[in-house]
């Protein structure tokens, strides 16, 4: 019985790997997760630097707001995003003629971005906080502008935290389900397709897709972790 189940699972996995709709959904998960991570990096790194280096009124409130996506239920996050980015939403309505978020790729990216950005921002902030600001000040006293001191001193020293934060951000983005289906059920990403197959066809049809998604993401995750570990050894040397 056990051997028969293994054979059935393997054959189902091979069949899933040949299914274009499955491959498209998994690729879309990886692609939109990458876009969400890229946007998180572009917006989150400057925000993390400001939070690590500057004191201002309301700083703790800003930090708390940035952490809201980590603790709020993701269906609630999806409803909030739908209210803002839907066709009649605060942002979705004015931009409806330019870009649509409801059941569209931008909506998937927005949902992933919302739930994953705090992981990168918090990791980057920790990295910047661990760097002695006197190193930047020394570079600036020698005539280096702020952007140059950041690019050639602060950024390399915080690179490991930035890489780890990016990995966690990407992993969190591609695993998101609740917020994504509320804002953009279509086009289907991997988790949405698994849910669709499970509710319509049962466990036997959804399990191979889940296993395939795990294998693909785990492989990429291990590679990124190995790069991070190698980076750590390089820094120590």
Regions found by a protein language model. Name each.
Residues 1-9, 18-129, 153, 157-178, ...:
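Membrane-water interface segments at the C-terminal ends of transmembrane alpha-helices
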Residues 57, 145-146:
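Short coil/turn motifs that cap or connect alpha-helices
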Residues 125-136, 146:
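Membrane-helix/interface signature in polytopic inner-membrane proteins
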Residues 139:
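The alpha-helix within a helix-turn-helix
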Residues 142-143, 156:
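Glycine/proline-centered hinge or cleavage motifs at structural transition points of membrane proteins
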Residues 188-189:
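Extracytoplasmic catalytic/substrate-binding loops of multi-pass membrane glycan-assembly enzymes
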